[in-house]
Every structure is written in C-alpha cells, then in structure tokens.
Amino acid sequence: MLKLSASTSKSKKISKLLPITIIGMGLTTAMTLPAQAADVIYHGNFCTPNRTSVNRVEFNQFGVHNTSSGSSASVQCPFNLPFSAVLKVTDVWLTVYDRNPTTNIECTLRGVGLEGSTIWTRTAFSSGSSPVHQFLSFDPPSTSVATMNMSCTIPTATTNGVSHITTYRLMTTP
C-alpha cells in the first residue's frame, strides 16, 4: 500500500477540482461576453410578390425577377431580426441586376416598432441599366428597431433581359 504525504494529498485534491474550476471560469467568461453584431445575407428568393404582381414574378439562382414586358412588379422582402430592445441596424445592402434602360429598381426599407409603426424609411435606386450587378446601400439611422420591412419595385423586362433582386444583406449591432 502506498502512503501519500500531506502535500501529495493536497495536490490530488487540487487536480480533481481543477477541471471544475476551469469549467466554472469558462461559463462565467461566456456569460459575460458582450453581444455580437450580426451580418446576415438573404437570397432574393425570400422576396414575395404583392397580389397584383404574382403572375409577373419568377425565381431562380439570380433571385426574384420580373418577366413581364408590360408592367413593373412589386415584392416584399422579409428580415429575421433577433428580438432585442437595443438592436440597431448599421447597414443594408442589395445586389441587383437592372436590365431596363428607362426605369430603375427601387427599394424602400422601413424600420418598424413593436406596435407596427414606421420609425424611419430609406429608399435606394439602381443607377441605370447594366449587364453587371449593382450594389444598392441604405444608410439607416442609429435608432433601435423591433423589425424591418423592405418593399421593392422591379421594372419591366426588356430586350436586354429581366431585372433581378439577387441578394440582400443585413448588418446589426446589439
């Protein structure tokens, strides 16, 4: 039988408690970390047509687009914001393809309170027809929001092709 000295016995007790202490410190650290900012990208396929635009809108890997050569299409693009009393939207970006030489893609972003009231609005436009994508940016005010809504008008299809909302990106701080 092996006899342990007092110092060996203490070190065994400490080594048994060490993992518990480290885990406890880790949990404390994890619980006191500040909330992280969010950066989420949404595909244009999340946008849904308004009732009058249902027959003009189609979806593919380029997102939502208007196939009508006679009328523009209106869509609503949702956001999934985490519930927070202090959530602030820092930036919203859209990637669009505008193929109409006379009408731009137009999107209006709304910050909405819990009761449904509009807190702020921002509108962005594409800058003319182009075969390559364009980035549209909103500069939202630094106020807290409960949720957001974005409505967009996609111009008619032309011989240049159809206009798309491909992706939209949301950046927030807690």
Q: Which ranges hold each PLM region?
A:
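N-terminal secretory signal peptides that target proteins for export/translocation
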Residues: M1-K13
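Bacterial N-terminal signal peptides
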Residues: P19-A30
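A short beta-strand element within beta-rich, extracytoplasmic domains
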Residues: L87-D98
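Exposed low-complexity, polar/acidic, P/S/T/G-rich flexible segments that act as propeptides
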Residues: C107, T153-P174
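Noncatalytic modules at the cell exterior or secretory-pathway interfaces
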Residues: P140-T158
